[in-house]
C-alpha cells in the first residue's frame, strides 16, 4: 500500500504542471469527482454503430438511400420495437417516412382524410423509435444532435416515461399541442432526421466517391453536412483531387472518363466547368471523324440525341489523345516511375498503321491522328495547349470543386486505423513472395506503412503548395502516379491499358496484371503481417478493403483470410452489377459485432417514396462479440481512460494539498 502511495506521489510530481492547468478546468474536488463519474459512466455505454460504404462511383440516389436507411438498420429497429403490434405495410410506411419525411408527408397530406389522427399515431411511433435509437448515448450527446427549434420538446418526450396518470397527461398534451398549432409536419421531419442521425455514430467511406456515376458533387454535398465521417481516398477520388490541384494530366483523365460514360453533368452542372473549349476544338479537328471507338457508353435509363452522342464521342477522342501526350511528358520527367512501357505514341508506325508491343505487331483499328506529329508525338499542338490551359484554369478556380477537395483532404487519408480496424481503398503493394514492395520516391525507398504515409503527405502538398512552384509540379505528377502507377496503393495493377482498349482489337493486350496483394489477401498470415505493420496486433483487428467488386454470382466470398480481411464494394456502379450479381456490400459494426450486409438492386428515389420500396438487404453476422462492446473498448474509450487517469491524479493532488482548490466566495 505504501509502495502504491509513493508511486502515486511520484506520478503527481511528474505531471504537476499539467495538473495545475487541468485544475483551471476543474477547480474543486466536487467538479473533478463529477467529471470522473460522468466519464466512467460513458465508458460503460454500448459502442456506437459504425457504417462502412465503399465505391459509390457518383451514384447519388442509391448512396443517399443507403445513408438514410443505414443499410437496413432502421428497418430492423422498427421490427424489433413494434414486432407484431404493426402490420408489415405499416412498418414499411413508417420506414419510408423516416427516410424521406418531407416527400412522404406531401403524399400523405393529399391522401389522408383524418390527418390529425394520423399525426397523433405517427408522432407516438416516431418518438418510440427515437427513444430506442438514442438509448445508447448520453443525454448530453443526444442534446447536441437535437434540432434547435424542437430541442426542448424532443428532450422532454424522449426522457419522460408516460407511465403515471400525470405523466401520461403531460405527454399527451405535448403531442396534442404540436398538432393543434400546425407544427406536426415540421416536427415529424425533424424527429425523422434525428433518427437517421442517431442510428449511425460514424460513417466510413472507403474510397471512390467519384467516377462514372451522374453526380458525385451531390454526394460530396451530403457528406459535408454529415455529423461524423471519414474518407479513405480511392483512385478516382485522387484523380479529381489532382485535377483541382492543377494537374493537367489528372484533369485530362477526369474529362476522358466522364465523356466515356456520357457523364459530363458532374463537371458542367455540378462544378460549373465550361467544356465548350474542348467541344469547339473537337469539332475543328475531329469533325469528319466518326470516332466509332469513342462513342460513349450510355446507360439504358438515359437518352441522348444522335448529335449529342457524336459530339461527346469527338470530345472523348480529343481529350484521350491529349491525355496520352500529357502522360508521355510526365513519364519522361520521372524515369523513377518506371513507366516507359506506357509511352505508346512513339511506338506507332504511321506508314502501316501498326504498333509494336512486347515484340509483337498489332494493327490499329483507328488511324485518324490529326494532332500527332510522328516526329514528336508527345508535343501538344498550340490549339491543344490552349484547350488544356482553359480547362485547367476552370478546374483550379471552381469554388465548389475546391471546397469539396478541401473536405476530402480534411476528412480523408490514404488509410485509417479506427477501433482495431485498418481501412484502405486499394492495396498494400507486395512482392511476389508476399513481402512489402519497396518503391522509389525521389531518392529514398519506402514500403508498407511508410509508403502510404509518404504518398499521403505528397498528395496534400500538391493541393496546398503555391501554384507554379517547382514542388507543386512534382507533387502533381505524384498524384497522377497514384492514379495509374505500377506500385500505387490506389491502382494496384502493373499497367493501365487505356490506349490498347481504344486502338487494338486483340483483347490479350487489354490485360492488366494485378499486384501480388490480390493473390495474398486470402492468406491469413499476410493479412496479420499487414495489420502489424500498421500497429494493429489485436486478435480482433481486421482489414476493411474496397476497390475490387466481389463476384458473388461466381461464388466469391467477401470475407477473406479467415475473417481478417473484408472486401466491401457498395456495388453502386450499375456497370458492375451484372458482373457481381448483386448491388454490393456494406458493413455495420455495432456493440454486438460485425455484420456484412448484401444489397439487391435499387431502382429510383421516386419509387422508394411512392411505392415504399426499400433495398432488399441480407445480413450476415460473421463476427459476434463474446460480450457486448462498450465505449471503453474503442479508440475514444482509450482517450477517456487517459482523461480519467489524469482526473484521478488531480483529485489525489487536491486531497494531499499539493494543489489548492479554487472555491468562489
UniProtKB/Swiss-Prot annotation:
Q: Does the keyword Hydrolase apply?
A: yes
- Kindly indicate where the leader peptide sits in this chain: none
Molecular function GO labels: fructose 1,6-bisphosphate 1-phosphatase activity
- Pfam families found in the cross-reference section: FBPase_2
Q: Does the keyword Iron apply?
A: no
User: What cofactor does this protein call for?
Assistant: Mn(2+)
Pathway as given in its UniProt record? Carbohydrate biosynthesis; gluconeogenesis
Q: Sorted alphabetically, which HAMAP family does this protein's record hold?
A: FBPase_class3
Gene Ontology process terms (BP):
gluconeogenesis
Q: Which Gene3D superfamilies match?
A: 3.60.21.10
The entry's family comment says: Belongs to the FBPase class 3 family.
Catalytically driven reaction(s): beta-D-fructose 1,6-bisphosphate + H2O = beta-D-fructose 6-phosphate + phosphate
Which organism encodes this protein?
Clostridium acetobutylicum (strain ATCC 824 / DSM 792 / JCM 1419 / IAM 19013 / LMG 5710 / NBRC 13948 / NRRL B-527 / VKM B-1787 / 2291 / W)
Quote the protein name from its UniProt record.
Answer: Fructose-1,6-bisphosphatase class 3
Q: Which InterPro entries match?
A: FBPtase_class3, Metallo-depent_PP-like
Q: What is its EC number?
A: 3.1.3.11
Amino acid at each position: 500500500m505504501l509502495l502504491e502511495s509513493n508511486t502515486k506521489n511520484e506520478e503527481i510530481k511528474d505531471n504537476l504542471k499539467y495538473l495545475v492547468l487541468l485544475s483551471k478546468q476543474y477547480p474543486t474536488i466536487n467538479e473533478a469527482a463529477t467529471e470522473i463519474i460522468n466519464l466512467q459512466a460513458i465508458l460503460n455505454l454500448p459502442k456506437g454503430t459504425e457504417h462502412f460504404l465503399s465505391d459509390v462511383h457518383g451514384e447519388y440516389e442509391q448512396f443517399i438511400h443507403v445513408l438514410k436507411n443505414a443499410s437496413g438498420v432502421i428497418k430492423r429497429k422498427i421490427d424489433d420495437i413494434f414486432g407484431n403490434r404493426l402490420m408489415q405495410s405499416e412498418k414499411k410506411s413508417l420506414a419510408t417516412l423516416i427516410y424521406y419525411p418531407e416527400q412522404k408527408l406531401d403524399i400523405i397530406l393529399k391522401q389522408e382524410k383524418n390527418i390529425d389522427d394520423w399525426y397523433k399515431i405517427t408522432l407516438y411511433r416516431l418518438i418510440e423509435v427515437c427513444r430506442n435509437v438514442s438509448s445508447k448515448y448520453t443525454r448530453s450527446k443526444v442534446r447536441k444532435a437535437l434540432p434547435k427549434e424542437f430541442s426542448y420538446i424532443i428532450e422532454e418526450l424522449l426522457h419522460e416515461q408516460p407511465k403515471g396518470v400525470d405523466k401520461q397527461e403531460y405527454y399527451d398534451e405535448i403531442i396534442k399541442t404540436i398538432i393543434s398549432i400546425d407544427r406536426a409536419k415540421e416536427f415529424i421531419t425533424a424527429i425523422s432526421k434525428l433518427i437517421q442521425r442517431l442510428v449511425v455514430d460514424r460513417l466510413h467511406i472507403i474510397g471512390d466517391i467519384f467516377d462514372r456515376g451522374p453526380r458525385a458533387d451531390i454526394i460530396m454535398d451530403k457528406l459535408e453536412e454529415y455529423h461524423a465521417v471519414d474518407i479513405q481516398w480511392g483512385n478516382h477520388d485522387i484523380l479529381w483531387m489532382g485535377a483541382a490541384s492543377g494537374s493537367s494530366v489528372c484533369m485530362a483523365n477526369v474529362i476522358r472518363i466522364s465523356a466515356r460514360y456520357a457523364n459530363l453533368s458532374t463537371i458542367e452542372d455540378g462544378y460549373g466547368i465550361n467544356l465548350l473549349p474542348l467541344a469547339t476544338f473537337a469539332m475543328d479537328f475531329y469533325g469528319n471523324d466518326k470516332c466509332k471507338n469513342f462513342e460513349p457508353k450510355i446507360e439504358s435509363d438515359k437518352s441522348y440525341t444522335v448529335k449529342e452522342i457524336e459530339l461527346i464521342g469527338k470530345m472523348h477522342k480529343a481529350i484521350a489523345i491529349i491525355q496520352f501526350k500529357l502522360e508521355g511528358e510526365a513519364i519522361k520527367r520521372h524515369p523513377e516511375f518506371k513507366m516507359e512501357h506506357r509511352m505508346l505514341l512513339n511506338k506507332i508506325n504511321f506508314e502501316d498503321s501498326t504498333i509494336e508491343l512486347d515484340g509483337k505487331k498489332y494493327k490499329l483499328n483507328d488511324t485518324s491522328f490529326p494532332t500527332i506529329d510522328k516526329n514528336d508525338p508527345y508535343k501538344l499542338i498550340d490549339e491543344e495547349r490552349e484547350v488544356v490551359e482553359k480547362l485547367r484554369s476552370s478546374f483550379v478556380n471552381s469554388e465548389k470543386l475546391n471546397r469539396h477537395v478541401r473536405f476530402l483532404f480534411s476528412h480523408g487519408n490514404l488509410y485509417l486505423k479506427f477501433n482495431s480496424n485498418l481501412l484502405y481503398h486499394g492495396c498494400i503493394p507486395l512482392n511476389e513472395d508476399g513481402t512489402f514492395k519497396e518503391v522509389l520516391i525521389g531518392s529514398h525507398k519506402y514500403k508498407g506503412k511508410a509508403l502510404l504515409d509518404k504518398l499521403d503527405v505528397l498528395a496534400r502538398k500538391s493541393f496546398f503548395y503555391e501554384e507554379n512552384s517547382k514542388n507543386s509540379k512534382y507533387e502533381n505528377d505524384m498524384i497522377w502516379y497514384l492514379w495509374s502507377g505500377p506500385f500505387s496503393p490506389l491502382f494496384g495493377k502493373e499497367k493501365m491499358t487505356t490506349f490498347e482498349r481504344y486502338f487494338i482489337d486483340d483483347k490479350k493486350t487489354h490485360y492488366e496484371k494485378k499486384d501480388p496483394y490480390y493473390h495474398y489477401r486470402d492468406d491469413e498470415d499476410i493479412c496479420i503481417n499487414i495489420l502489424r505493420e500498421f500497429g494493429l496486433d489485436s486478435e480482433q483487428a481486421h482489414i476493411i478493403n474496397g476497390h475490387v467488386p466481389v463476384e458473388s454470382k461466381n461464388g466469391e466470398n467477401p470475407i477473406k483470410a479467415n475473417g481478417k480481411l473484408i472486401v466491401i464494394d457498395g456495388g453502386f456502379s450499375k456497370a458492375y452489377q451484372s458482373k457481381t450479381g448483386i448491388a454490393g456490400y456494406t458493413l455495420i459494426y455495432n456493440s454486438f459485432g460485425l455484420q456484412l450486409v448484401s444489397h439487391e438492386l435499387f431502382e429510383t428515389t421516386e419509387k422508394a417514396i411512392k411505392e415504399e420500396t426499400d433495398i432488399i438487404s441480407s445480413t450476415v453476422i460473421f463476427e459476434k462479440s463474446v460480450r457486448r462492446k462498450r465505449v471503453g473498448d474503442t479508440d475514444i474509450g482509450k482517450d477517456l481512460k487517459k482523461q480519467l487517469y489524469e482526473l484521478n491524479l488531480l483529485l489525489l493532488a487536491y486531497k494531499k494539498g499539493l494543489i489548492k482548490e479554487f472555491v468562489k466566495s
